[in-house]
Curated annotation (Swiss-Prot):
Its EC number is 3.1.-.-. HAMAP family: PelO. One of its GO terms (molecular function) is endonuclease activity. The N-terminal domain has the RNA-binding Sm fold. It harbors the endoribonuclease activity. PANTHER family: PELOTA, PROTEIN PELOTA HOMOLOG. Its main location: cytoplasm. Keywords: Cytoplasm, Endonuclease, Hydrolase, Metal-binding, Nuclease. Monomer. This is Protein pelota homolog. It comes from Pyrobaculum islandicum (strain DSM 4184 / JCM 9189 / GEO3).
Length: 330
């Protein structure tokens, strides 16, 4: 994602480059923000019977947001507060921005919003991880998964219902290739990985171009084995999985070395004790007035911040503990 932050005018210019960038933009936008950009809207000048859809530059005051990970879409709704010269009758009406990769928008934040933490969130988006299309295959089942910085999504499951001889494997692998080709067109992964028992992936690699990762299992079990493996380590770091595992360990041996829930984390933040904080994305959206100043203070005291998706591997556990926890320095 390309971005510029004008701290004097409190304006953030953003150009999302990948669908994952839309998630980070969603995190940054709060109700009451001003969003500017080019958009398409039906316009009907006075005296004209029928309107037409035209491209115009306008600004809205945000009232609501709608982010869909699986559809790769971000919609921002609000009331028009600014419009380009020569366009009458639009100001004061409602409008929806559809934010898509390649389209620039501006976010104007309120004066009490900590811009320091904006840079931290944008850096998370900038630390681009490869998008992986994982084909986890064995002789009975193939599971297709899509792995990004936002988590793991199971896209499709295919079963080998034929005999386990060479001719049926040819049909099986040919069918797998067709699904792979379609998923590559749809998701545009950076890397395609073929994982499973050595003999199976060697045969499958004659049909599918991919990085081969031999492992004990294929199918759904193979997806989880791949996630636990070393190749997935960088994703685990970025998504906070390793930090959460450290948190659980420290909680079991020394309760005073961690903070649980907003009150404890805020108290530790005020004392400058935060080493790393894990915060649920839904808590940020539900209580921005509490969470953004907290994260800004963590950032100022050189603590690390991990934003965790509620539907991720550690999201459920984090939600059960109030949506925010921290590892403490002392």
């Amino acid at each position: 994602m390309r971005y510029e932050v004008d701290t004097k005018r409190r304006i953030i210019k953003l150009v999302p480059e990948r669908e994952e960038d839309l998630y980070f933009i969603y995190l940054l936008i709060d109700k009451g923000d001003i969003i500017r950009g080019w958009t398409v809207r039906e316009y009907k000048p006075d005296g004209v019977k029928e309107g037409e859809r035209i491209k115009i530059y306008l600004a809205i005051k945000v009232e609501s947001l709608e982010y869909h990970k699986f559809r790769g879409s971000l919609r921002i709704r609000g009331t028009v507060v600014e419009v380009q010269d020569g366009i009458e009758g639009v100001k004061g009406r409602r409008h929806t921005f559809d934010v898509t990769p390649g389209r620039e928008i501006e976010i104007e934040k309120a004066y009490d919003y900590p811009l320091d933490v904006v840079i931290e969130v944008l850096n998370m988006a900038k630390a681009v991880l490869p998008r992986v299309l994982l084909i986890s295959v064995d002789d009975e089942e193939t599971v297709f998964a899509y792995i990004t910085a936002l988590g793991v999504e199971i896209l499709h499951t295919m079963y080998n219902t034929g005999r386990k001889d060479d001719s049926m494997f040819e049909e099986y692998f040919t069918a797998i290739k067709e699904v792979v080709d379609e998923l590559k067109r749809r998701h545009k992964p950076d890397i395609v990985v073929l994982a499973g028992p050595s003999m199976i992936i060697e045969q499958a690699s004659e049909y599918i171009q991919a990085i081969k990762v031999p492992q004990g299992s294929g199918g759904l079990a193979g997806v989880y084995e791949f996630i636990r493996g070393g190749l997935y380590e960088k994703f685990k770091i970025e998504m906070g999985i390793n930090v959460y595992q450290r948190f659980i360990h420290k909680l079991s041996v020394d309760r005073l070395s961690v903070a649980i829930g907003l009150n404890e984390v805020r108290e530790a933040t005020d004392a400058g004790r935060i080493e790393t904080v894990l915060v649920l994305d839904t808590l940020i959206k539900e209580r921005p007035e509490d969470i953004w100043p907290l994260l800004a203070q963590v950032y100022k005291t050189r603590g690390k911040i991990h934003i965790v998706k509620e539907d991720s591997e550690v999201g459920a556990g984090l939600k059960a503990m109030g949506g925010v926890v921290a590892l403490l320095r002392w």
